[in-house]
Amino acid sequence: MESVADNKKAEFTMKAIVVTDQAAGTAGMTLMERPVPKAAINDVVVQVHASGFVPTEMEWPSTWTDRVNRNRTPSIPGHEMAGVITSLGYGTTGLWVGQRVFGLTDWYRDGTLAEYVAVEARNLSALPGDVNFTVGASLPISGLTAWQGLFEHGRLQAGQTVLVHGAAGAVGSMVIQLAREGGAYVIGTGRAADRQRSVDFGAQEFVDLENDVLEDVGSVDLVFDVIGGDIGKRSAELIRAGGTLVSIVGPVQGGASNCRMVDFVVESNRCQLNEIVQRVRDGRLRTNIGNISGLDDAFAALNPTGRRKGKAIIRIRP
């Protein structure tokens, strides 16, 4: 039988996936009890219903250190989620306890692979009642990365040709759909097994990077690079004068002097989240969700033996 002390402990602790060893990566994840966070000034605390996860988080300095490079482990990974607000910090406006929300959390704070998370209110957007928590959690990083890469950094215009690497992935599939809606002609790339999925999301051509010649696509106006390396360099050479390569994997060398090379880190933006979720509601934007698992059995989903397909989602609450 549970004691009063056990019940009190349950009120102040939560389950969370924690990392302590950068060398171990996702294999070093541990499920443990952590204190439930409190809402600081301009914060809210959200009861997490579903969390997304990006495997490269294990390579990000922000997972392991704070902004002045001090070790901040044990830390909780995961930075995109959907859930319900349980408390408001001083100064918070426009949100309320019990509200359904989704959003992107600060890279340098404990994340969303937990039952609760504290997050700045400005990083959250209302999650409409007709969008479930699993879908909501799949949108922030992939959707905002695609939106900012195309429209802020890529300056996409109707009639342009866009080359999208990783076309069947969580980000690439969003890029394809938003670029098509923006009036672009879209060429996707990937492996042979990705062809049909890329076409299903809207790619008008597809390049199998293992068997086709990338340069056969001709000149393009915009490259969205999620690969880097040699593919990134070769892609830069395809850009027309005045065109742009946007990268989420670091700077890319090469390209003509009259082309723009932009590498960026996605940022939270409430207005853009609103635009993205409205497109989901309207049927104009489809999510690309892969494995879905619970918090207690998340390790298999976060450490897959095969190639990842789509966004990994951890359901924190049934």
Question: Where in the sequence are the language-model features?
Answer:
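Short, polar loop motifs at secondary-structure junctions
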Residues: 190-194, 211-212, 247-253
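Glycine-rich phosphate-binding loop and adjacent beta-alpha segment
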Residues: 226-288, 292, 316-318
